[in-house]
Amino acid sequence: MARKKVLVLHSGGMDSTTCLLQAKAEGHDVASLGIDYGQRLLVEMMFAEGQCEKYSIPRHVINVNWQKAERQIPLNRSVEEMAHSVSPAFLPGRNIVFLGLGHAHAAGIGADELQIGLNCVDFSGYPDCTTQFYDSYCTMLNIGNPGGPKLVAPLLKMSKPEIARLASTLGLQRNDTWSCYRPQIREGSIVACGECDACKLHEFAWQELK
């Protein structure tokens, strides 16, 4: 496999961290890109930074903010419930903005690829996590920046348990990444709530490995 310069859009969650470590394991020249968009989950940025430090991967961060509507975080939904509706936690425009910024940054540093942890075999029902969205975005980028970095989604058609299995082979453990929408402070430590959709999906993914 030819060595490439790969920029990974990296939140600190399981999917994007798996992409990051897989690209590194394949021998590519890898860098991590985080987007600080005024999110409530600064803990995810801390996890991403810690992962990059642990694996000696350069970390880039873009700071951007825009007006966001208040969102309700649903609790204790089953995986089956998540499959049949768009979560109230969906943030319109987020992936559209992230991929545009990521692609521009990838072009700026001379990367061959922008890798993303997009996963359409998911239960969130997010319209910007579908094969149609991904294919359409790739088409737009090819028109708007022909010859630019390729947008690659290595996990696109993998299930959550399959991603967890791959993550495990790369050395990741269940608590090495952060996905929770509602971090809690317990006994002076930041912990996942265990009730939001992200926590339930994370639990589902890793339980399947037992």
Curated annotation (Swiss-Prot):
Give the top-rank taxon of the lineage listed in the UniProt record for this protein.
Bacteria
Q: Name one GO biological process term.
A: queuosine biosynthetic process
Q: Per its UniProt record, what Gene3D superfamilies does this chain match?
A: HUPs (3.40.50.620)
Functional pathway: Purine metabolism; 7-cyano-7-deazaguanine biosynthesis
Please state the Enzyme Commission number of this protein. 6.3.4.20
GO molecular function terms noted in the UniProt entry: ATP binding; ligase activity, forming carbon-nitrogen bonds; zinc ion binding
Q: What class of enzyme is it?
A: ligase
Keyword Membrane set for record: no
Give residues annotated as binding ATP: 10-20
Keywords of this entry: ATP-binding, Ligase, Metal-binding, Nucleotide-binding, Queuosine biosynthesis, Zinc
Q: Which cofactor does it need?
A: Zn(2+)
The record's catalysed reaction(s) read:
7-carboxy-7-deazaguanine + NH4(+) + ATP = 7-cyano-7-deazaguanine + ADP + phosphate + H2O + H(+)
Residues reported to bind Zn(2+)? 180, 193, 196, 199
Q: Which PANTHER family match?
A: 7-CYANO-7-DEAZAGUANINE SYNTHASE
Task: Please name the HAMAP family in this protein's record.
Answer: QueC (MF_01633)
**Record family assignment:** Belongs to the QueC family.
**Protein task:** Catalyzes the ATP-dependent conversion of 7-carboxy-7-deazaguanine (CDG) to 7-cyano-7-deazaguanine (preQ(0)).
What name has this protein been given in UniProt?
7-cyano-7-deazaguanine synthase 2
State the species of origin: Rhodopseudomonas palustris (strain HaA2)
Gene name, per UniProt, is queC2
